[in-house]
């Protein structure tokens, strides 16, 4: 017999194991009325036990975790439950083997064909396994589970990965597991309210298909602080493990595996349709404001769901989780355990067929293995380089007509509008001829001038600003032109989904705002210089004279 102690405390399953005894498949016993009948389906043994030749296990139970299920005890009373002969060598002293309560298969841990429990205080301290109880233990002995494992155990893939990574979440994510801490008076309720026991609800478990590891990067990843003002995950690639097909299902989400996606939040706030349904008022509280449930667009829902909503972390109280999730909760890694985890409530399509979860996982694993093999076969230094888009990047952005052959600062010369179009220029700016003619006519009335020749007026030069040019330089060049008109160089049909008039209006407003800021700054500087000169002349007791030529003090 192999013995294994519990050096890590309550979270690990303290157990003893030994070789199995012979059991006939027809060996059953009638379940009588009992005072301790826990639901042990969520009790998971260490992985080494499932691959060990030892098939009998003895595990200590905890009353605050493995509580008595009164409804299940009344329901299964009189049922035929599988049993086996418990070896007396498991216990150090004489033990009342006839007081073990064998349980039905649905109440046993995963992978067991038979098993039973000794209630609290049933075993005397001298008969309790030494490695499963402290030497100075006082009071009644804790309950004990004795089970017989199946000969061949096929655990679900998510349980296998959970056993592999138990306590080994990445440190960079600071993943924690949120656990409920129910009080005694809540656990001793005569009428439990768990959704798992209701005919119109089912409690599901979220399974995330493992994502391929990201390629190595020479740049350190910046830590993004976690915010819970809004929480809208993308659940389109998760699998929903539902024990029963019901109209509504509830599942606890993980802030680590199901993070907030900003694009989903934008979709919920836009024009995209988000199918809604009425949440049962007897189950879910009325949450308003930032705590209200967010309904997701259908393309972000799990497969087979017609509508669904998400409660962000901390929006539901811990008392709600204790009352309605209770002992059926599945632990999920979270960034913080200080607040309650997020919750998904979905409405399942009645017409949709159930998705083969294991087939889906198998296909995804084969796909990832093929990608890995292909990457290894084509591995080279060039393969590590990031792939660049084949779409040509635009160089130009802003082209203007000027009368000077020298381009403004930050711009370069072009020969024609065709060249500007080839470089990707979108906006064309030229002098407003109507405003220029009106202004020249007003000046001619006061100061008659010689009219320029037609050839001189037609001589224009094109200057182009790149798409990454300094907006201050663009604003300066536009202001130096005086009155100007702005238009698109390309046709609006060549810019699908873009409102050309709105783009020109916004760009014009930006340039006007820049010009106003520059004018205001210049005025402040001139006022400051004037005050400094005036104070200097007053200090020197000199008369203050304003120069008629330059407008400054001399």
Curated annotation (Swiss-Prot):
SMART domains: DM7. Keywords: Repeat. Belongs to the DM7 family. This is DM7 family protein GG17593. It comes from Drosophila erecta.
């Amino acid at each position: 017999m192999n013995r294994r102690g519990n050096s890590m405390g309550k979270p690990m399953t303290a157990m003893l194991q030994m070789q199995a005894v012979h059991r006939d498949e027809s060996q059953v016993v009638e379940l009588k009325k009992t005072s301790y009948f826990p639901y042990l389906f969520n009790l998971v043994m260490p992985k080494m036990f499932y691959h060990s030749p030892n098939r009998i296990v003895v595990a200590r139970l905890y009353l605050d975790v493995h509580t008595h299920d009164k409804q299940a005890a009344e329901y299964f009373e009189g049922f035929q439950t599988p049993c086996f002969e418990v070896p007396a060598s498991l216990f150090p002293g004489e033990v009342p083997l006839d007081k073990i309560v064998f349980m039905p298969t649905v109440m046993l841990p995963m992978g067991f064909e038979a098993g039973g429990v000794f209630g609290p205080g049933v075993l005397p301290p001298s008969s309790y396994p030494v490695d499963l109880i402290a030497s100075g233990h006082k009071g009644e002995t804790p309950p004990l589970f004795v089970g017989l494992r199946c000969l061949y155990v096929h655990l679900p893939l998510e349980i296998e990965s959970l056993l592999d990574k138990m306590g080994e979440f990445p440190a960079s994510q600071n993943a924690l597991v949120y656990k409920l801490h129910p009080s005694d008076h809540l656990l001793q309720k005569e009428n439990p309210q768990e959704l798992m026991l209701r005919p119109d609800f089912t409690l599901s478990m979220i399974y995330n298909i493992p994502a391929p590891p990201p390629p190595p990067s020479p740049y350190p990843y910046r830590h993004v602080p976690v915010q819970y003002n809004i929480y809208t995950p993308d659940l389109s690639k998760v699998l929903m493990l539902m024990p029963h097909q019901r109209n509504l299902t509830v599942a606890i989400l993980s802030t680590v595996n199901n993070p907030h996606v900003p694009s989903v939040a934008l979709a919920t706030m836009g024009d995209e349709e988000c199918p809604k349904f009425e949440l049962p008022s007897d189950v879910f509280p009325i949450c308003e404001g930032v705590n209200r449930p967010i309904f997701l667009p259908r393309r972000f829902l799990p497969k087979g769901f017609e509508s669904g909503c998400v409660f962000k972390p901390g929006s539901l109280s811990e008392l709600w989780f204790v009352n309605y999730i209770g002992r059926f909760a599945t632990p999920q890694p979270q960034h913080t355990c200080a607040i309650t985890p997020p919750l998904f409530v979905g409405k399942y399509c009645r017409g949709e067929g159930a998705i083969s979860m294991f087939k889906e996982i198998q296909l995804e694993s084969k796909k990832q293995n093929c990608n890995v093999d292909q990457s290894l076969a084509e591995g080279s230094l060039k393969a590590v380089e990031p792939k660049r888009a084949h779409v040509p990047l635009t160089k130009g952005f802003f082209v203007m007509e000027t009368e000077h052959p020298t381009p403004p600062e930050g711009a370069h010369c072009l020969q024609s509008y065709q060249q500007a179009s080839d470089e990707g220029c979108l906006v064309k700016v030229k002098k407003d001829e109507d405003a220029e003619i009106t202004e020249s006519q007003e000046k001619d009335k006061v100061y008659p001038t010689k009219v320029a020749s037609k050839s001189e007026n037609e001589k224009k030069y094109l200057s182009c600003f790149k798409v990454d040019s300094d907006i201050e330089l663009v604003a300066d060049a536009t202001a130096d032109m005086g009155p100007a008109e702005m238009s698109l160089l390309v046709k609006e049909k060549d810019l699908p989904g873009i409102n050309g008039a709105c783009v020109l209006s916004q760009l014009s407003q930006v340039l006007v705002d820049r010009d106003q800021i520059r004018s205001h700054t210049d005025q402040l500087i001139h006022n400051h210089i004037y005050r400094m000169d005036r104070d200097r002349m007053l200090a020197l007791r000199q008369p203050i004279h304003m120069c008629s030529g330059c407008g400054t003090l001399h």
